């Protein structure tokens, strides 16, 4: 039988923050290798093999005899999570439950903002915003005049 959870130890900062030592690893978490031949390397989790309890990390590869680069899977006991990906609601809720049980403050709500809105807000300066507001007001006044003209004829 395969256990669905591959628990990985948390970094010291996250242990203090969340009040737990281990948490299931998932795609998107940032991890660091703490022992083995690749000690010190780290990156974003790309894949979790639940059968062998090993984790593939972005940028950690091994070259085959023919020169191809393939993912290097690391045992879950040799890594620690340095940043949790809380974009999935079930993981965030689990941390909230743990915090409530241990009388700790709830974790911060994960930021779910799209890059499109950030870029559009950054490209518009204060002067541009004022100009667009003036244009909108003029359009509203023109529309009101048209509505008033049309109502007098009818």
Swiss-Prot record:
A GO BP entry is:
translation
Against InterPro entries, the record matches this protein to: KOW, Rib_uL2_dom2, Ribosomal_uL24_CS, Ribosomal_uL24_euk/arc, Ribosomal_uL24_KOW, Translation_prot_SH3-like_sf
Would you say which domain of life the source belongs to? Answer: Archaea
Q: Choose one Gene Ontology CC annotation of this protein and give it.
A: large ribosomal subunit
Output one GO MF annotation: structural constituent of ribosome
Annotated region Disordered: where? 97-154
Query: Signal sequence: where?
Result: none
Q: One Pfam family, short name please?
A: Ribosomal_L26
For this UniProt record, give its keywords in alphabetical order, as a comma-separated list.
Ribonucleoprotein, Ribosomal protein, RNA-binding, rRNA-binding
Give residue spans, biased composition: Basic and acidic residues. Answer: 115-135
- What is known about its subunit structure? Part of the 50S ribosomal subunit.
PANTHER family membership:
60S RIBOSOMAL PROTEIN L26 FAMILY MEMBER
Q: What does this protein do?
A: One of two assembly initiator proteins, it binds directly to the 5'-end of the 23S rRNA, where it nucleates assembly of the 50S subunit.
Similarity field: Belongs to the universal ribosomal protein uL24 family.
UniProt protein name: Large ribosomal subunit protein uL24
The encoding gene: rpl24
